[in-house]
């Protein structure tokens, strides 16, 4: 191979042009950057990157081809107190690599050193990047662009969703191919969801602590390479990108959007005890928030925090997001611990990354969803994200659980959450879709576990049940665990029905956790991040088909109610909503605050949700008109009701006139 030509500062990463490969690497504080390429036997050849444009180092390797394995050695000061941890003995991966080979093992050779650098070379065990070529036929693929008002999100794990599906060929279960299989497409369509939100798909690693315990990071919130797909979800690592795009193309043909859960808040380099394999050795001071003593600000709980206010890191983040949209045609993102995106270090709505996203026509036109908190001071920012972000609404989650399971929430607060939490989100010209309503998510109890367990049971995680939240607002209905008498099972079923109805018929954007429509249980584990086993995999053969039918009917019903799909704030006397007591009269101030947990919600003047959240059977006088129950509440004998509905304890029904 020849020596490197100067090359260009863009595009980011390694780019094949048909004749050779252009390499770029951002580092504001490096003194020298070596490109290291490896042959099939692992022999290494090094080249200095000859070009530097601002803080971007670059070079062009003629005759290089896709499949070339490479990494970097970056030279500069080892000054931990100042935040500099350059160590050319350690091979580093390209932060913009499209494919990474190897597994990040718990190996002391991957550590960079503490007060002094570790001079042992680690190329033999280090991760390697692989040059790729982007050739793919999207055919007539088009983004569904489902309006927010019609959007119903389904949060799922690529492997857990399909790994036990008996109708999918065993050799592709748990992969992208399974995700796009006709059986899954048909299921999504039958259920009625419009968007599939996938837990992290970018290349991730298991933390050393988990490796030592014989566990693994199942969820994927420990990113190694943010542009590269996680190889375990591919049938073949060489074709991972095409397999992923095939799945997206199939989902798009069915009108289903794909939203990626993306982790921009930290990296798998963790704290100072963690490995040095990329950002830490490339430009630690720029990429991370550094304390005065050189340690990391740990606003993520993962050991480090990316500095998304630094211009170079902002550009890195935006380029990453654009890659997933432009190259993979994804339809949006859910941002993990998204308050980090707005830290300067204080949270600001005009933070550099927010401004860059808003000014980018590619990124500002896709769905953007924030998990609106981190664990640092001032990290809880629910309601404070700028447009066009929507946000996970934990107020809704807790209120729904408290109302139906704890029975200690006033009608007024329940109604406020049902109406889209305008007290939280009706600002800065935001619409009700800004509230992403959820009862459950990957993090926490499943819906079934909410009605079967009062306490978490996380012993399998190896932390003596200390991990996971204790604030579950759950109710086991008198017996801890699954199973029980017929009466117990029926009461739990009624609670599940009430929670699902609240979720799917409320103002805002509903998000359903995959498996909740099956009755999936994690046996009380509310932090199953390290359980890559039958505890988290959906068991399709044991799925509760009746509950699935109930859920699908609710989603279909939602799409028929103008007040829910219009994505407009409800105003008094606008015909969208009326709040009534059990006698079909407007609720009084006293009833809002201290009345019995009984009410009627009239939507679009035609759809009535009658609620009896008490423990007693109650007669509820319906408003004037001829009412009949509608699916999924209609039985075989569905007479017209003109006066009174006998509301069962802890029950509800939806009528239409």
Curated annotation (Swiss-Prot):
Active site: 336 (nucleophile), 371 (proton donor)
Keyword S-adenosyl-L-methionine appears in the UniProt entry: no
Gene Ontology BP annotations: glycogen catabolic process
Site (Transition state stabilizer): 443
Pfam families listed in its UniProt record: Alpha-amylase (PF00128), CBM_48 (PF02922), GlgX_C (PF18390)
InterPro entries: GlgX_C, GlgX_Isoamylase_N_E_set, Glyco_hydro_13_cat_dom, Glyco_hydro_13_N, Glyco_hydro_b, Glycogen_debranch_bac, Glycogen_debranch_GlgX, Glycoside_hydrolase_SF
Keyword Hydrolase: yes
Ranges where the record places region Disordered: 459-479
EC number assigned by the record: 3.2.1.196
Keywords recorded for this protein, A-Z: Carbohydrate metabolism, Glycogen metabolism, Glycosidase, Hydrolase
Domain of life the protein comes from: Bacteria
Pathway(s): Glycan degradation; glycogen degradation
Catalytic activity: Hydrolysis of (1->6)-alpha-D-glucosidic linkages to branches with degrees of polymerization of three or four glucose residues in limit dextrin
Group of enzyme by EC: hydrolase
UniProt GO molecular function: glycogen debranching enzyme activity; hydrolase activity, hydrolyzing O-glycosyl compounds
Cited function: Removes maltotriose and maltotetraose chains that are attached by 1,6-alpha-linkage to the limit dextrin main chain, generating a debranched limit dextrin.
Family: Belongs to the glycosyl hydrolase 13 family.
Protein name (database record): Glycogen debranching enzyme
Organism: Citrobacter koseri (strain ATCC BAA-895 / CDC 4225-83 / SGSC4696)
Gene behind the chain: glgX
């Amino acid at each position: 191979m020849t020596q490197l030509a100067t090359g260009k500062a863009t595009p980011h990463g390694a780019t094949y042009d048909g004749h050779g490969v252009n390499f770029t690497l951002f580092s504001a504080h490096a003194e020298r950057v070596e490109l290291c390429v490896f042959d099939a036997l692992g022999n290494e050849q090094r080249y200095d990157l000859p070009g530097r444009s601002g803080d971007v180092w670059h070079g062009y390797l003629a005759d290089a081809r896709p499949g070339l394995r490479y990494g970097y050695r970056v030279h500069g000061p080892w000054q931990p107190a100042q935040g500099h941890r350059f160590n050319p003995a350690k091979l580093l991966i390209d932060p913009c690599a499209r494919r990474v080979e190897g597994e990040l093992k718990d190996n002391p050779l991957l550590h960079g050193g503490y007060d002094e650098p570790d001079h042992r070379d680690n190329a033999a065990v280090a991760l390697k990047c692989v040059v790729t070529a982007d050739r793919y036929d999207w055919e007539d693929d088009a983004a569904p662009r489902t309006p927010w008002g019609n959007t119903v999100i389904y949060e799922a794990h690529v492997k857990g969703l399909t790994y036990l599906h008996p109708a999918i060929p065993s050799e592709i279960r748990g992969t992208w191919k399974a995700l796009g299989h006709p059986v899954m497409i048909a299921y999504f369509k039958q259920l009625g969801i419009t968007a599939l939100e996938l837990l992290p798909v970018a290349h991730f690693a298991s933390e050393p602590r988990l490796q030592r315990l014989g566990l693994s990071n199942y969820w994927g919130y420990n990113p190694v390479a943010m542009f590269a797909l996680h190889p375990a979800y591919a049938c073949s690592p060489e074709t991972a990108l095409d397999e992923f795009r095939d799945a997206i193309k199939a989902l798009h043909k069915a009108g289903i959007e794909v939203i990626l859960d993306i982790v921009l808040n930290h990296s798998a380099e963790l704290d100072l005890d963690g490995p040095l394999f990329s950002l830490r050795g490339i430009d630690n001071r720029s990429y991370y928030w550094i304390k005065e003593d050189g340690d990391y600000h740990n606003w993520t709980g993962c050991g480090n925090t990316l500095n998304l206010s630094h211009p170079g890191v902002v550009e890195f983040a935006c380029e990453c997001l654009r890659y997933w949209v432009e190259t993979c045609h994804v339809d949006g993102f859910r941002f993990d611990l998204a308050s980090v995106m707005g830290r300067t270090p204080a949270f600001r709505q005009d933070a550099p990354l927010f401004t860059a996203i808003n000014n980018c026509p590619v990124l500002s036109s896709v769905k953007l969803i924030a998990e609106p908190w981190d664990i640092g001071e001032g990290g809880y920012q629910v309601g404070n994200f700028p447009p066009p972000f929507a946000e996970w609404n934990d107020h809704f989650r807790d209120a729904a659980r408290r109302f139906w399971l704890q029975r200690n929430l006033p009608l007024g607060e329940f109604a406020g959450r049902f109406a889209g939490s305008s007290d939280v989100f009706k600002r800065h010209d935001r619409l009700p879709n800004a509230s992403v309503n959820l009862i459950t998510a990957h993090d926490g109890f499943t819906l079934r576990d909410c009605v079967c367990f009062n306490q978490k049971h996380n012993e399998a995680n190896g932390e003596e049940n200390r991990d996971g939240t204790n604030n579950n607002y759950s109710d086991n209905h008198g017996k801890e665990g699954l199973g029980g008498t017929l009466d117990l099972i029926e009461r739990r079923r009624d609670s599940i029905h009430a929670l699902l109805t609240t979720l799917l018929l409320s103002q805002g954007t509903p998000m359903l956790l995959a498996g909740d429509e099956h009755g999936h249980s994690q046996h009380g584990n509310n932090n199953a991040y390290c359980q890559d086993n039958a505890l988290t995999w959906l068991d399709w053969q044991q799925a509760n088909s009746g509950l699935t039918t109930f859920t699908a009917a609710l989603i279909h019903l939602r799409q028929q109610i103008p007040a829910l799909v219009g994505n407009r704030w409800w105003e008094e006397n606008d015909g969208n909503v009326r709040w009534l007591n059990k006698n079909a009269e407007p609720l009084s101030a006293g009833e809002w605050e201290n009345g019995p947990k009984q009410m009627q919600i009239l939507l679009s003047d035609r759809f009535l949700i009658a609620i009896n959240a008490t423990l007693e059977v109650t007669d509820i006088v319906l408003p004037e008109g001829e009412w009949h129950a509608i699916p999924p509440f209609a039985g075989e004998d569905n007479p017209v009701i003109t006066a009174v509905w006998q509301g069962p304890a802890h029950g509800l029904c939806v009528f239409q006139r």
